[in-house]
Amino acid sequence: EALAYLDEVTGTGPGGALLAGLDNVREPHLHAFLDAKAAQARERRVVLRLGDQTWIQGVLTEPVVVTTVLGNLVDNGIDAASGPDGGQPGEVEVEVIADGDTVLVTVGDSGPGIAFEDADDVFAEGVTTKPGAHVPGGRGMGLALARQIARRVGGDVWVADAGGRGSADDDEPGGAVFVARLPGVLAPTDEAEDDSYSQTDEPGVTP
């Protein structure tokens, strides 16, 4: 087990292979950023995955905005999904989709979900999704910052699913799912526009 975990962390085993689906992220900033986040996740015994619908190309016009929002959502997911050493690896799934000049981000995790009665409370400064809602020392700022930055460019970040309920046939509780909408942050290339058009003309054909 120790050797398997070492392979996973160093990227030499099946769990440490290149982030599957990364070829669908053709924007250079996001490509490098997600690759680095996958490595960070492995160090925390968390597997980062890309959702099947992930597809983005072009050039970010607001790379700091996008990577800050995405980074905080991914970090939050890693924190929620990471468990004790020797336990099952956690999972974080990220989906990044281009819609014209808008970037849509969805981040879900295998953690315990949001415990607050009002899931929106998780965006208050000093609050975290980890056990012990209010965190001293200035932590618990990531989600609040992500929402503030998204709203600054006319977008938003919200909780799509608070998770934590699970099902009768599933012993593992479902984690939280966050969505971010960031308008005006992507300059589509001519190739991206052509691909979008061809996909519309040929349903069922994916890049």
State each model region's role.
Residues A4-E8, G21-R44:
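Short beta-to-alpha transition helix within the HATPase_c
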Residues V47-V69:
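Conserved short strand/loop->alpha-helix "switch" segment adjacent to the catalytic nucleotide/phosphoryl-transfer site
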Residues P89-D101:
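Short beta-strand/loop element within the Bergerat-fold HATPase_c
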Residues D109:
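Acidic ATP/Mg2+-coordinating residue in the GHKL
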Residues I114-G126:
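Short conserved segment of the HATPase_c
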Residues G142, A146:
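Short alpha-helical Gxxx[C/S/T] motif in the catalytic ATP-binding
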Residues V153-D171:
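Glycine-rich ATP-binding loops of the HATPase_c
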